[in-house]
A protein has these predicted regions:
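Bacterial Sec-dependent N-terminal signal peptides
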Residues: 1-28
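Structural motif
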Residues: 13, 168, 231-234
Length: 338
């Protein structure tokens, strides 16, 4: 894990060096100046132009021509924010945001346009009232001796001691369900630390690149990502990971790692994606900009920006709430019972 973290830090340092160059360009704090600053920041540092051109025909030059006609130096900040936010929406990227004091421009279509495939009330029913909590993990043993771990976020890291306790408590179970549905991400190191409990050897899990220049295709060669086994207690039985469209960013990476581990099956819906390491800059008006700067790929060098397919595509049923059962959890239990 230290090797992957070192590579990540080196790449982020390179991105920081490049992004600082944005400040070398002086733009007036006018609607036109802010438009030009934003378009150029994205043009020189965003990492998915080629991929998204192939996926849905994104043409950043055409986007500029279309939106510059909407810029008028008499427009107010609300109007400018709306136009610039709409332009950023053309990237279809949940890691691309613009922050003002009154709003956040965002694109959440990666999960808003799809069924949620999760119910908080049903998850509470499976957890009951006597479940255990270790850092951000909620866990218990279900009636059929299957371990259930609810991991709703990687915003903070579970310590090695926390993970040891979870592994020890569930050790007698015949299988394990890890539910990361609606996990919007957080720390990649937290995702790595958890995934490291499910492999006994160093395994290639993917690749990363960083920008080496201002050209849209100025990238380093692909640098491998490896997952090293934890020195703590490791799980040796079958595992099912549950996913939906709201699995994003570091959680998307977790699913990527787990698909490379033995005895792991992914069940649910395609993940939301978010495979660009985000970085930040600022416009003359003072609004912060976040964007994807370092692309990440799976072990086959394929992009996961628009998500990872499950091994078994399962949706929640329309009558799940009425029956009090979660079709995705129940499918996982059946797999572990085979």
């Amino acid at each position: 894990m230290r090797t992957a973290l070192l590579s990540l830090l080196v790449m982020l340092s390179a991105v920081a060096a490049l992004t600082s160059c944005v400040d070398d360009e002086e733009y007036a704090n006018t609607p036109r100046g802010n438009f030009e600053a934003l378009w150029r920041i994205i043009d020189e540092h965003y990492c998915f132009f080629d991929y998204k051109q192939k996926e849905y025909g994104l043409d950043w030059d055409e986007v500029r021509l279309r939106y510059v006609s909407r810029i008028d130096d008499t427009m107010n900040d609300d109007q400018l924010f709306e136009v610039l936010g709409a332009m950023l929406g053309e990237l279809r990227d949940g890691h691309v945001n613009m922050y003002s004091s009154w709003d956040v421009a965002r694109n959440w279509s990666w999960h808003e346009d799809y069924p949620s495939n999760i119910s908080d009330s049903l998850i509470r029913r499976y957890l009951g009232t006597d479940y255990r909590i270790a850092a951000s993990l909620c866990y218990r043993i279900l009636d059929d001796n299957v371990g259930y771990v609810r991991c709703a976020s990687f915003a903070s890291e579970a310590g090695e001691g926390n993970l040891d306790e979870v592994m020890y408590y569930l050790a007698a179970c015949r299988g394990l369900i890890i539910d990361v549905r609606d996990n919007g991400g957080g720390l990649i190191t937290a995702a790595e630390k958890m995934a490291a409990r499910f492999t006994n050897k160093r395994v290639l899990v993917g690749y990363m690149q960083h920008k080496t220049g201002r050209g849209r295709n100025d990238f380093s060669s692909m640098e491998p990502q490896y997952l090293n086994p934890s020195t703590g207690m490791r799980w040796q039985k079958r595992v099912v990971v549950l996913t939906n469209r709201s699995v994003y960013s570091a959680a998307n990476e977790f699913v990527k790692y787990m698909k490379c581990c033995p005895q792991v099956t992914v069940v649910g819906d395609r993940t939301g994606g978010g495979a660009g390491m985000p970085f930040s800059s600022e416009l003359p008006v003072g609004w912060s900009i976040r964007f994807s700067a370092c692309p990440m790929y799976d072990a086959d060098k394929q992009p996961t920006e628009f998500g990872i397919e499950p091994d078994h595509n399962v949706a929640m049923g329309k009558d799940d709430l009425q029956r009090g059962t979660d079709s995705i959890i129940e499918y996982a239990r059946q797999l572990l019972g085979q």
